[in-house]
Structures are given as C-alpha cells and as structure tokens.
Design a protein with these regions (language model features):
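Conserved AMP-binding/adenylate-forming
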Residues: 21, 47, 62-112, 117, ...
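Conserved pre-ATP/AMP-binding loop-to-beta segment of ANL
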Residues: 37, 153, 168-203, 210, ...
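Conserved AMP-binding A3 loop
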Residues: 50-53, 190-191, 199-223
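Structural core segment of the AMP-binding/adenylate-forming
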Residues: 68, 98-172, 492-494
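AMP-binding/adenylate-forming catalytic core of the ANL superfamily
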Residues: 107-117, 124-126, 289, 398, ...
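AMP-binding/adenylate-forming catalytic domain of the ANL superfamily
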Residues: 154-155, 510-533
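Gly/Ser/Thr-rich phosphate-binding loop
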Residues: 172, 261, 286-291, 300-361, ...
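Conserved AMP-binding/adenylation subdomain of ANL enzymes
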Residues: 222-239, 247-288, 302
C-alpha cells in the first residue's frame, strides 16, 4: 500500500540529503542480534529476552503469519499493555510485510469499531483479559460485524474454551516456529519498501473522541528516531523504560522506536503504580524513562529517597503539559534531567532539547529544529514572513513528517500543502537557536488590538508556590473584543485569590494589558480525549457562558 502524499521531488530530496534511507526497523534488530546477541533487549515481569532471542522470535512470528497466507500489506491491530510480546508482535508485523496499528489497552468497542472498519483489519493481537476486561469477548462481537477480521492472536499461553474459530496463542506459535527452520527467501519477498510502502498506522487524539489514523512508511520514522538517539545521547549501554503505554509517543518514541537503533535495552512496566515504577528503575538500573506528566505527579507523592535512582540519566515526558514547578520537583527528587520537544502524530516531529541543555532551555523551549526540517514564521493575519526575532505562526516541512491521514487525501490536503509545508498552529519565536512556544494561534487573545500570548502568562503563574497548574483563555467582551481569564488548579487545594494572582504577576513586571481579568480556581481541567492535554475550547465555552449569565 503506497503513501498518499509524498512527491518524487520530496523523496529525491530527502534521499539525496541523507535523511531518508532504505532501512526498516527490523534491520536494527537484526544488527543488534548479530553484534549484541547475548545482551538483553527486552524485559517485562515474565520474560527476559536477548537480542539474539528477540530476532529469532520475531522471525518465527513473521514466518508463521506468512504461512497462514495473511496477504502482504494487510492491516493488523495490536492492543497490548507494555510487554515483551507486544514489542515482538509490532516488529514481526513489519518483518512479515504487514501494516500494524498499535492502540492503547483502554480503547473499547466504540473506538475499535471505527478502526477495524476503517483499516479492514484481518487480525488482532490481544490479551484474553486485562484489568478485569475481556478483550476476546469484545473482538468476538467485532468479528460478527466485520467478517474480514478473521484471526485473533492471544498473548496468553492458552486459548480459552469456546474461543472463536481462528483464535491462536501467539506465544505458543512463536515458540513452536522458533524451533524450526525459517524460509528466509519467503520473508525477504515480503520486505516493505521503506519509502514506497506504508508500514504502520498511528492514532491521534481529537475532540470528537474518535481518533484519526495517520499513515507512515518507515523512512520518516527512522529519520526522527535517529535524531532522538542523537539528542538523547542513547547508546547500547542505556536501559530505557516504558512507564507510559508503548502505544503512545511518550514511551513508544523512546523505547520502541529509538532504543533499538541505539541497541539499548528496554524494560516494561505493565501497569502503572508509582512505587512499582521507582522500584523497577532501581532494580533494572534504568537510565531513561518515558512518562506522561500525570505519572511524574504521582511518583512525586512517593518517598523517592527509599530507592536508588542514581542510574537515571533523563526523563522523556510527553503527551500533556508539564508545569515548570512539577518539572523542577521531579528533577530534584529523581536526579535526572527532563527533556522537551515538539511534534504531533498528524505532522511529525519538529524539534527537541538535548539532555545536557541548560535548565532554562529545557523548561522554556522545545529545543532546536531536528535535522532536515525547514521553518517559516508567518504573521497570523497576513501570512507574510515576520521580522527576525519577532513571533509568528510556525510553519515547517521536512523528512520527519508522516504521509498523511490514512486513505483520506482530502483531509491530508488541509494539513499539508503540495510542497509539504504544514503548521502546528503554535506561535513561536527563535532565540538561542531554540523554539520558544508563546501559544497556539487559535488561543492567542486580542484585547483592544493588543496580542496576548497565554503561554507567557501560564509560564509566570506556574512559578507561584500555590499554583499546581494553569490554563489561560480568552472570553468575549463588547468593549475590548476579548479579555483574559486564568484557570488555576491550586497546590494542595490552597486558597488562591484574584488579588494574589495580580500582585504576583505585577511583581513579574508583566504589562498591565496582559493581566488576567478573571480567575477561576478549579479541581481539574477538561482533557482532549485521553491525551491529558488541556481542552481549552471547553474552558473558553465555560467562561463565555458564565460572562453571558452575568456571573
């Protein structure tokens, strides 16, 4: 199946400049098996697998799927918690010439109905049960709706009685096939083109609750992963750890995509518990962990001094806003730098901080542009380039971007222009060669003709000792057009007044017109889907309704 967006000119450019290669992710697993064969590759609570063993199991799974006559480029859905076999299934799909879609364990029939139908998936890989939910029953029901979903592979060692026809134990199939010769020619015949074939699908978070699907060949993903290996300084001496689900970017970018390129080991925490996470870091001497901000908050509630975390080198936090205050507390408690970066599933990776960058750069910026990315800063209203040093809407193009939305050329064309330029919608400025995020173009507040960037106010308020998190939004006003409201979650439920907020911001020398004119102290923020990102559209509607009611 061919990608829908790349032109021959783009392909030639990225190949000529060395950003795209003819490599697949499997090639790095094969190299690691050859050069680091006895070194551990994957670890969970049940299995410890070396690179040599991992390659053998991957080949066995892939060859089994080929022998089952699953057609090349068929779609296969992998829904698993963090596990060794979850990783093996993902790379085996690529090896067998299949297109994998790895999804979060918490997705249920509503979301999966869309995905199974949209992808015409022929197989799924799941646990029978997990966290008191029966996945096999759910997919049995989906099979009744979609006859093309012919096969179910279980991570369990046994197939339960009464399972639908076409249900297999993946672990037993893999172990049996690993004892027999593999037809290498049959697998080579299924090799995907790293540029010309879709290899994997990813999901986006959205306000509708139904994720969109994004298609990727391996070339841009490998390009980004090599960039991450460089800025994180990953080597085959590192031990990465998935605390967040490997299906998402927070942990998946670090552990599934980047670690094998470096030859680094990956340890998996199957189910999050703050004590268990810290204990596993100590036990496995993890050097890098992938988390979402909520994980850090909960880990800070534990006495970290009970654990030896001296091995930890850096923390990759993504998938939601991490306040500077929480970042400071986490770095102090865990003794590791927290990195920041910019990217989306829809548009690809833009930039990133190096682990050794100063605290100010890691807190306040999203780092330098990744190799090969080109950037333009345009005026929000005129679309003309802004003067050097001035803020503008970020537009970029480069070798890190996906092919587009799966089987949706029309939607893809609304995000990428014919030459590959796209925008995250962020208003940014360049300083010290780094991107400083000032806010989203759609979130910028225009008060009496003056621009107010929410991120600037949020960054200042997050330094207040009573503030745990803050979101700044605009609301309609007849006189000024818009005014500013600060939504605040106070630390420990402390009282926090409007007067305290204003005095604090005045002390920070904030211009008078930027001072919020309303304060709403709340217990939590609405989120965009399951991403953990603050849904500012909901907050805007809420405050606009309050103002209209005269509250």
């Amino acid at each position: 199946m061919k990608p829908i967006r790349y032109t021959q000119e783009m392909v030639d450019e990225f190949l000529k400049d060395g950003y795209w290669t003819r490599e697949l992710f499997y090639d790095f697993w094969e190299r690691n098996a050859r050069e680091l064969g006895d070194q551990e590759a994957l670890v969970d609570s049940k299995y410890r697998v070396t690179w040599a063993e991992a390659k053998k199991l991957v080949d066995a799974i892939a060859y089994t799927w080929v022998q089952m006559d699953i057609p090349q480029s068929s779609r296969i859905i992998i829904q698993s918690p963090n596990s060794v076999y979850g990783f093996l299934a993902r790379i085996a799909a690529e090896r067998a010439g299949l297109i994998s879609l790895t999804v979060y364990p918490y997705l249920r029939e509503r979301e999966l109905t869309y995905m199974v139908e949209k992808t015409e998936a022929v197989a799924v890989v799941i646990l029978n049960e997990y966290r008191n939910f029966n996945y096999l029953e759910m997919y049995r029901d989906l099979q009744k709706k979609f006859p093309h979903l012919e096969k179910i592979f279980l991570f369990d060692d046994e197939v339960p009685q009464g399972a639908p026809e076409g249900t297999y134990s993946l672990t037993q199939l893999a172990k049996a096939a690993a004892e027999k010769p593999i037809d290498e020619d049959a697998l080579k015949a299924r090799r995907l083109d790293p540029i010309g074939n879709i290899a994997l699908l990813t999901t986006t978070s959205g306000t509708t609750g139904i994720p969109k699907l994004v298609e990727w060949p391996t070339a841009p993903r490998i390009c980004t992963s090599k960039g991450r290996v460089d800025i994180w300084g990953l080597t085959n001496k590192d031990t990465t750890m998935a605390i967040a689900p490997h299906a998402g970017g927070a942990a998946g970018t670090l552990t599934y995509f980047a670690a094998p390129i470096a030859g680094a080991k990956t340890v998996m925490l199957e189910e999050f518990d703050p004590e268990a996470a810290l204990a596993l870091i100590e036990k496995e001497k993890a050097t890098a962990i992938g988390v979402v901000p909520t994980h850090l908050v909960r880990m800070l509630e534990v006495d970290a001094s009970k654990y030896d975390l001296s091995s930890l080198r850096f923390i990759r936090s993504a998938g939601g806003y991490l306040s500077p205050q929480i970042a400071e507390e986490a770095e102090t408690a865990f003794g590791a730098n927290i990195t920041s970066d910019l990217g989306t599933q829809d548009m690809g990776s833009v930039s990133g901080c190096r682990v050794e960058d100063s605290k100010d750069l890691r807190r306040r910026t999203v780092g330098r542009m990744l190799p090969g990315n080109k950037v333009r800063l345009l005026d929000k209203d005129t679309n003309e380039p802004v003067a050097d040093g001035e803020p503008g809407v970020l537009y970029f193009r480069g070798p890190h971007a996906p092919a587009g939305y799966y089987r949706d050329e029309e939607l893809t064309s609304t995000v990428f222009d014919p030459k590959g330029w796209t925008t995250t919608g962020d208003i940014v400025k360049f300083d010290q060669e780094c991107l400083w995020i000032l806010g989203r173009a759609k979130d910028m507040i225009i008060r009496g003709g003056q621009n107010i960037y929410p991120a600037e106010i949020e960054g200042l308020l997050n330094d207040h000792p009573k503030v745990a998190s803050v979101a700044v939004v605009g609301y309609p006003d007849r006189e000024m057009g818009e005014r500013t409201c600060a939504y605040v979650i106070s630390k420990g439920g402390q009282a926090f007044s409007f007067e305290e907020m204003v005095e604090f911001l005045k002390g920070k020398k904030l211009a008078m017109y930027k001072l919020p004119e309303r304060l709403e102290v709340v217990a939590e923020f609405p989120a965009v889907g399951d991403s953990g990102k603050v849904n500012k559209e909901t907050l805007k509607k809420e405050i606009a309704a309050k103002v209209e009611r005269g509250e």
